[in-house]
Amino acid sequence: RRLFETNYWGVVNGSLVAADHLREREGGGAIINVGSILSDAPIPVQGVYSASKHAVKGFTNALRMELMREGATIAVSLVKPGAIDTPYNRHARNLTGQAMQNPQPVYATHVVADTILYCASHPIREITVGGGGRLIASFYSALPGVAEPLFARFAPSLMRDRRSAWQPDEDGLYDPTEDGLDEEVYYPMVRQFSALAEVRKHPGIAAGVVAVLAGVGLATLLLNQRTGPTRLETLRGRFNPREWMDATGLRTHIDD
């Protein structure tokens, strides 16, 4: 209940206050809510958190449609981060009796912040930060009957931090913690860039890159068809390691 008061009702109340303000503002504005990749794909151990983020997604989508019906010039965006380099696991209430972590890939906090700022000036309905999380969510959406047994088997072990037996003396469920941390300090690798988010923010550039790659592939295919197998065999011969050695001399050396 406490988690929902913060994760869900905090978003609801904040969004409604923002909508009232932006209705009266000339030019409207943007409401950007932060969901999670777990808005799309629930996982064990984090069931209540997943449920709260599903609720955030449902409310955000409904709010967008209600504002559309009103004709309000208010864009509503949902940002869905994957695993992020925050002290999330330190500050959450941990009932497992084990040290926990977010599985890789983990992204830096500024990657999410930059995406939120982009949504403030570029209306985007929904955007995911982190390709790994998007892959998991797509897999769950396409094959839930296959995904759920796999998640049940492997997700808890992937979230366990075997490098540390550390357990928090306090958590942030009811009161703020006093460790002063805004980033986790133990992740061996933190990604500073999300290609998936950049593609979503700049679809024209992404389409151009795909077109260039498709053109190169087509040109290669046409060249092969025009030159025929003779040219192809010549290229293979140049890069055939068997032709780079003296087979007779090698056989003699082995016999000796």
Annotate each PLM feature:
Residues R1-E5:
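Active-site Tyr-X3-Lys motif and surrounding loop/helix of classical short-chain dehydrogenase/reductase
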Residues V17-G27:
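A short helix-coil junction within the Rossmann-fold of NAD(P)-dependent oxidoreductases
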Residues R69-R162:
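SDR active-site lid
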